[in-house]
Amino acid sequence: MSLGARLNARLRDRRVTHALRRVLDDFLPPVIREWRPLNRWMATRFHGPAFDLDFKERAFAMSSRQIAAAYAALEAGGGRYRDTDTTPAQIAAITAAARGRVLEVGCGNGAVAERLAAAHPVVAVDVTLGSAAETRRRAGCAVALAGLPALPFADRAFDTVVCAHTLEHIPDLAAAAAELRRVAGRVIVVVPRQRYYRYTVDYHLHFFPSAAPLVHLFGGRAELIDGDWVLVAG
């Protein structure tokens, strides 16, 4: 296996990229950490040439359709470099906390939905066609093309809603949180523990170095698992 292939294989491990992010965010001087050429190189390495380094500067003025198109372009350009951002320990925590009929919002390629569908009736939604199709194939559950902050479901249509590695991408965080609380009695959320920088190798718009904002939005209790916050409320 070539050096590049070995590096890519290691980067597919979420725990490895957590360690790398900690080095970059906590130990590099800000003048280096925010150096645009370094971030451009890293973004291309992780996500391919379609990655927009200035996305977070523009996203708050974009429509939901424009944001969905940006993610579709990133996905089409090879932007998905790992099977899922949710680690096995996080998936285990999610499945242990889920109850009854489950909605997954931001299903990606279906890694979480696949596990949930083994024990629960599951409906999954995502804003990109590729993700929705892959989830349908992999999890065998009902899938819809939809996303936050407006879900096409009645109040309390589900017992549990799962939203893993999605909230940090939604411009209107308060509206998204209210929508998750509306459709289900129990909310399970996973977000990265990450501090803000102008340039990050992702399309994150919100940052959670502490779980306090998450608990304020949903109540419940947040636990740090494999470097990410996992919150269960309701």
Task: Label the model's feature ranges.
Residues 152-155, 170-171, 198:
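Activation segment
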Residues 1-154, 177, 201-234:
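Conserved N-terminal segment of class I S-adenosyl-L-methionine
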Residues 162:
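A conserved beta-strand element that flanks and buttresses the S-adenosyl-L-methionine
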Residues 100, 159, 185:
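Conserved acidic residues
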Residues 170-179:
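A short, conserved alpha-helix within the catalytic core of class I
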Residues 165-169:
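Short catalytic micro-motifs in class I SAM-dependent methyltransferases
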Residues 184-196:
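Conserved beta-strand signature within the Rossmann-like core of class I S-adenosyl-L-methionine
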